[in-house]
């Protein structure tokens, strides 16, 4: 059922109107993964990986959506049984995996970006995988399980150390951004506390005015309230600005940048794999390097 839904999704994505940017997108993709030709051994696999990127990850600048999100938004013509699966595809996991264990009909892999392990139903597990293989792949959720799309970019033995070192750079950057986000949230929490104190002070003074009959005392309290109101407005504005700043930072640095860094690394590694595929007597270490 997952494969049927994926095939249906691809069929829609490469047809009008979703295919309008296909050629432009291919140029964007090959800028990082290298230009591919029909006589390349991995041509079909790479074209399949390109289509996955086009559907699941490329943002259409005019809509600020992926092709997948656009298809879901305009889902009137999609059969309901397939639409249910396609909606789940939003939670796909694109990553660099290492094979931990191979069984008849299944494989256990670990996502090197998160260290999370997955037991995947894979009838051809012994044909596709070998223990300690490092590869790029995409997991699609279906019910309570995950399935690979079947399109992979396998990296040669001897590249694991380099790949892990590149992943570590991304994770270090992510931790730095998360630390900064935590600091921003702490700052905002303190500012809201100050605002709440000011608001409570104003409320207490307003309640006090009601209980007093002395005009002089009333005017004195009202003067205090008048002095606190502009302070409250400034504090409210500051809190709103901090909220907006945190929202933007979370979207750009935590979500988008984190995802983009991973994608760019996988594309860079795919290009290195292509160079290795075409190479003649070139040491692997001279390809998988910065």
Question: Where are the regions that the model predicts?
Answer:
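A short macromolecule-binding patch
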Residues: 116-121
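Acidic, low-complexity intrinsically disordered regions
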Residues: 101, 111-113
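Short helix-loop boundary/capping segments
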Residues: 158-163
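C-terminal effector modules of nucleic-acid-centric enzymes and ribosome-associated factors
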Residues: 149, 164-211, 215-290
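Short nucleic-acid-contacting surface segments enriched for D/E, G, S/T with interspersed K/R
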Residues: 122-138
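Short, charged beta-turn/beta-strand-edge "cap" motif at the junction between a beta-strand
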Residues: 138-145, 152-155
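Accessory interdomain/linker segments of ATP-dependent helicases and helicase-like nucleic-acid enzymes
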Residues: 16, 20-100
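Short aromatic-glycine-enriched beta-strand elements
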Residues: 105-109
């Amino acid at each position: 059922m997952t494969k049927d839904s994926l095939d249906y999704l691809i069929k829609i994505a490469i047809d009008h109107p979703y295919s309008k940017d296909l050629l432009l997108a291919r140029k964007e993709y090959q800028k990082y993964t290298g230009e591919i030709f029909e006589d390349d051994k991995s041509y079909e696999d790479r074209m399949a990986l390109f289509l996955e990127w086009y559907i699941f990850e490329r943002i259409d600048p005019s809509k600020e959506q992926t092709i997948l999100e656009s298809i879901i938004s305009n889902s009137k013509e999609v059969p309901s049984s397939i639409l249910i699966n396609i909606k789940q595809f939003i939670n796909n996991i694109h990553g660099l995996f290492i094979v931990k264990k191979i069984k008849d009909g299944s494989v256990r892999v670990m996502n090197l970006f998160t260290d999370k392990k997955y037991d995947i139903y894979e009838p051809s597990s012994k044909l596709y995988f070998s223990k300690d293989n490092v590869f790029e792949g995409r997991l699609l959720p279906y019910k309570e399980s995950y399935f690979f799309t079947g399109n992979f970019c396998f990296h040669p033995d001897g590249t694991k150390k380099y790949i892990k070192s590149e992943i570590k750079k991304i994770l270090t950057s992510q931790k730095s951004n998360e630390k900064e986000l935590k600091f921003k949230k702490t700052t905002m929490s303190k500012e809201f506390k100050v605002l709440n104190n000011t608001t409570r002070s104003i409320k207490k003074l307003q309640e006090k005015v009601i209980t007093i009959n002395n005009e002089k005392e009333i005017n004195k309290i009202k003067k205090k309230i008048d002095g606190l109101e502009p302070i409250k407005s400034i504090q409210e504005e500051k809190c709103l600005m901090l909220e907006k700043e945190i929202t933007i930072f979370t979207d750009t640095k935590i979500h988008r940048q984190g995802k983009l860094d991973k994608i760019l690394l996988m594309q860079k590694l795919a290009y290195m794999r292509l160079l290795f595929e075409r190479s003649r007597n070139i040491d692997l270490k001279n390809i998988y390097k910065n």
